[in-house]
């Protein structure tokens, strides 16, 4: 059902809504999200931004990162990670393909993760190869390659990305996700996501691991996450990766006491995240 609704929304964005100027499209999209969650909607002041989402939308309208297309590409960004913080932070890559039919299931390990390189929310997590519906998976990946994330959110960094499917090593089930919100190269807040695919809980901390003065519509965990022993290392990694940018969110994981790079996000949730 979720995929079906995504297809409908993509068609709406690609055709009738494509006629709207960016400012109106952004406000329509933001208010649809607000209404869907029963949250008070408001008109975004993009020209004179004061709130976080307004500033994210300003950055969408005013690209100021010369290599943003490179950073947003989940395949090409690996070279930046290798050169900036070292190859040890990369999740092992199993394969990369331009065409879905070139992917041979028999040659993949029993557990793996398939992703599109040119957007967000396009993942297939396989924990047992014998249980995967491969035809369904291939149809989903064909849809990914056929369509552009730019149509959904008008994020400029996705507009001309060469589309590929990548396969990475599966780390573990329900791995904790640490997302570092970096302003002018400095990590200020940390979003922690737990049990994303079962009972998703989210909490926010400062860089000192103190509770942040805001949250989102996601419920917070009953027991707040403990400060990870690798926090200082992760803060250092986030600082190095975000040092040249007005804003970037650096996503990291911890697996078997090792820090791994997830992705660099320039416009979290397309500027439509709801903070309370």
Predicted regions and their residues:
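Membrane-proximal basic amphipathic "stem/tether" segments
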Residues: 1-63
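Phosphate-binding site of ATP-dependent enzymes
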Residues: 108, 130, 134-218
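Short, flexible loop/turn elements at secondary-structure junctions
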Residues: 97, 118, 169-171, 182-184, ...
